[in-house]
Amino acid sequence: MKLIVSKNFDKKDSYKIDTYIAGGGYEAVKKCLESMKPADIIEEIKKSGLRGRGGAGFPTGMKWSFVPKESSVPKYLAVNADEGEPGTFKDRQILELDPHLLLEGIMIACLAVGIHTAYIYIRGEYKKAFDRIEAAIAECYAKGFLGSDIFGSGYEIDIHAHAGAGAYICGEETGLIESLEGHRGQPRLKPPFPALSGLFAGPTVINNVETLACVPEIISGGAEKFAALGTPKNSGTRLFGVSGDVEKPGVYELELGISARKLIYDICGGVKGGGKLKGFIPGGLSAPIMTADELDTPLDFDSLAKAGSMAGSGGVIVISEHQSIPKIAARTADFYAHESCG
C-alpha cells in the first residue's frame, strides 16, 4: 500500500522545507497554479472521494463547494489542529514530522475556494508542534511560497499559527472560530453555518489537519489512484492512533475499511501481555465502545456508524479484560462534564 500522509515521517529532517521539496513537495500546488482552475481543483477532490478525517467524514470537495464563489467580505480557512480528545494523537504526527505537507494542502484549499488568509488553530499543549509549524511557515515566506506573490503567480496567501489554551470545546468548529476571534470558546448556534458566515463573519472553510494533508497527493497522483484505496464510499488511507492495552501502540497509516481485528492483532500485536480483549473504542473517547464480538467490523465511516459507533478522530483505544467498563464510562463522563459543561 502506498503511504500518503506518513510517507515522510521516517526521513531525516522530515520537517524541513528542503527535505520536503526533495521528495516532490510543493509540486502539487504549482500544478494548481499553472494548469488548474478553482473549479477543477474542487472537482478533483470530489472525484477522489476524500472525506473529512476529523470526525463526521463529510465529503471535502462538497464542503469546499458550499463557500460562495463571490463574496463582498474576505473568505477564510481555519485548520482544526485542536486535537484534545482523549485517545487521539494522529494529527500531532503530521504537525511535528511533516508540517509542509499540511501547508501545501492549505495552499491548494485556498486556491480552490478563493481564500487569501488561513489560520491553523493548534492545541495549547502541542508546544513542539506549534514551533514546527511556525518554523515551516517562516521557511515558506523566505522562499516566496507564501505572501503577496506565491511562487511568482500573483496570488496572495498568508498562513498564521494560533495556539489554543487547552480547552477541549474549541475543537468544535464554531467554538474554534469564537476562540480565534478572541472570545470565550463557546459554540455558536447554527445557522448561519461557517461556509456562509464564520470567522470574522466571512465565509469560512474548516478542515482537519489530516484531511488537508491528503490533498497534495490527490492533485499530484490523481483522484482515481486515491479513490482506488479503501472502499468505494470510504476512499483513501487513514491515520489510526492506537493506544490502551495493546502491545504496539502508535500511529499507523492504513486503508479505510481494514477490520479492527487486523489492526489490533495483526498490526499492533494484540492485547498487552496476551490478555483477552473486552472491547475497543474505534474513534476517540466520544465514540461508543464496541465489544470483542465486533472485531471484524471494517474501520470506516459507514460501517462503524451502522454498528452503532463512529470513526470519529481515528483514535482506537484497546480495552482488556482487566478494565472496568463502568469505571471507563464514569471517567469519560467526568471528562466531558469538565470540558463541555458550565
Task: Report residues per predicted region.
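Iron-sulfur (Fe-S) cluster-binding modules
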Residues: M1-S48, I115-I120, G236, G274-G275, ...
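Gly-rich Lys/Arg/Thr-decorated short loops/hinges at beta-loop-alpha junctions or inter-strand turns
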Residues: Y20-Y26, N80-D91, P194-L199, G241-V246
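Ferredoxin-type iron-sulfur electron-transfer modules in oxidoreductases and energy-metabolism complexes
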Residues: A28-E44, V73-K75, A81, K90-L95, ...
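N-terminal glycine-rich phosphate/pyrophosphate-binding loops that anchor nucleotide-derived ligands
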Residues: L33-K75
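Local cysteine-cluster metal-coordination motifs and their immediate loop/turn environment
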Residues: K47-P59, Y168-C170, K278-A287, S309, ...
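Histidine-anchored nucleotide/phosphate-binding helix
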Residues: D98-A112
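Short amphipathic, charge-patterned alpha-helical segments
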Residues: G105-A109, L256-G273
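Hydrophobic alpha-helical positions that pack around
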Residues: F130-L256, C268
